Amino acid sequence: LVKKLAIFLLFSVFSYAFDLNSSANALSSGKDLQISLENLDTNGSLNVGELVSRLKQSSNYDALSFSSNSLNLKFISTQKVPSALFVKSINLALEDANISVARVNSLKNGNEISYGILALKSGGIDPNLLNFTLSKSGFKIMGFDRLDGNLALYLDAKNMSLDASKVNFNEESPLVKSGGVYIVDVAGASSLNIISNEPNKWVPLVRIYDKNLNQIDLKRENEIKTNYTINLANDAKYALISDNNDITNIKNLPK
């Protein structure tokens, strides 16, 4: 069986000791804070929901910023993690929450990795939404800050992963329409067969990555396909399946 495996990155211990007061101020409207900061540390990460709740109860929550359709975000981790995996995991988590990346403002990878973007979402981007969607990709928010016009999120990234679809050998595995690319864990498979349920629309665009998200193959077609097979390298880990037209469903069958 091809198993859905989270990529556990066992690198340096997370060294950022987040400041609860800085986190509270980062989410506040700038007034004098009159909230308790007790019990906001949950298993080594910030209890974002409780902090937001306390700020709202005390009328300190920055509702104006977080109801705006755009927000400058900077994701920071002091752990030594592959930058491609860090960025891709964040981007896919945001996409899953219907948050668009309008612009990449910065990307640095030294003693710490930081990824700055202009994020867009109708109705606003609030801390609870960010916490929920990032947690699904294995991130923990350790704290917040305000840095050079950005809302900075300090992340524990040691358990980050791509949310890849689970597939079985020699069985059709329907993929639920995602609104974006389909991500399939193909580890252990020698080939991937993709069948489109929309025979008059799908034009294949498939990228193959290794476990560190280095692209090792690209398949791009200019004609409509209904059945498409790709031979996979031994180190293939992920297949990102895209298309140039709208499709209702794709099925894949690793062999």
Indicate residue ranges for each PLM-predicted region.
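N-terminal leader/presequence regions that precede the main folded/catalytic core
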Residues: L1-E95
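Solvent-exposed serine/threonine-rich low-complexity stretches and specific carbohydrate-binding patches
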Residues: V101-S106, D217-I224
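Noncatalytic modules at the cell exterior or secretory-pathway interfaces
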Residues: I113-I117, G123-K140, A189-N193, N231-N252
